């Protein structure tokens, strides 16, 4: 007959756990009793009350009729309304977002693509906000100046549309520069994007944030560079990456992005070290080749 040997340390640990559990149960019971002491019918000693409270007299006054005092009625209604207020909706929304985050992690562990998960999650969040945070209807936003006699305002002539400096700098890039790549082919334009597109771009960049890519150097050699060396926030990198032609379309379709092309695009504008090391002509060629290869897939 075989004997089972039990380690004495395991027994002592189990006994300690049992003692801690008993102490926890006793503490909970004491807290419950303390919190429900006012329900036990225990008398309150008047002598133990503060002096100011002891001087108070309790008179059985007749209840005032609210019919003759409409102000009291309104006050009572306001108090009742405040008593019936529900929990702060922002707290409920925060717990809802926490649950959404847990669901996203679980789906990603099963191998489902982040772009598909995020697009479904955005729709769920929009429907939740629309159901629990309705827009107040019937409210107008008229200014007080409309109550006075309106003054005739001369219409201003329409001004010519102005482009952002960033767009001007992108479109007016010279075919050859000393500190950056050549101008890329803008035949593949970027359409209006949404939050899910930015999320897909950020997801793919984050996956390869420390991966090093080969770039041509000025000395006819190569050097390695990655997104970490940019010393930039991921959000800023995503904003710059949106300027690469065709990136938004690839992200919308959930396809792989030309990360080396994106890295070269961002680094050529924000990294002085990269500008000093890279060969501009060769960089432009490999960026264009990467972009054409990914767009043709």
From Swiss-Prot:
Keyword Chaperone assigned to the entry: answer is yes
InterPro entries, per this entry?
PP_M1-like, PP_M1_C, RABV_P-like_C
**Post-translational modification (record):** Phosphorylated by host PKC and by an unknown kinase.
List where the motif Nuclear localization signal lies.
211-214
Q: What GO biological process, any one, is recorded here?
A: viral transcription
Query: Which UniProt keywords are present, listed alphabetically?
Result: Chaperone, Host cytoplasm, Host nucleus, Host-virus interaction, Inhibition of host innate immune response by virus, Inhibition of host interferon signaling pathway by virus, Inhibition of host STAT1 by virus, Inhibition of host STAT2 by virus, Interferon antiviral system evasion, Phosphoprotein, Viral immunoevasion, Viral RNA replication, Virion
Q: Where is the composition biased (Polar residues)?
A: 134-150, 168-180
Extent of motif Nuclear export signal: 49-58
Please list where the region (Disordered) is annotated: 131-187
**SUPFAM superfamilies per the UniProt record, alphabetical:** Phosphoprotein M1, C-terminal domain
Entry keyword annotation includes Chaperone: yes
What GO MF annotations does this protein's record show? RNA-directed RNA polymerase activity
Stated role? Non catalytic polymerase cofactor and regulatory protein that plays a role in viral transcription and replication. Stabilizes the RNA polymerase L to the N-RNA template and binds the soluble protein N, preventing it from encapsidating non-genomic RNA. Also inhibits host IFN-alpha and IFN-beta signaling by binding and retaining phosphorylated STAT1 in the cytoplasm or by inhibiting the DNA binding of STAT1 in the nucleus.
Q: Report quaternary structure and partners.
A: Homotrimer when phosphorylated. This trimer is stabilized by binding to the L protein. Binds soluble protein N, and ribonucleocapsid. Interacts with host STAT1, STAT2, and PML.
Q: Which family does it belong to?
A: Belongs to the lyssavirus protein P family.
Q: What is this protein called?
A: Phosphoprotein
Q: Which species does the entry assign this protein to?
A: Australian bat lyssavirus (isolate Bat/AUS/1996) (ABLV)
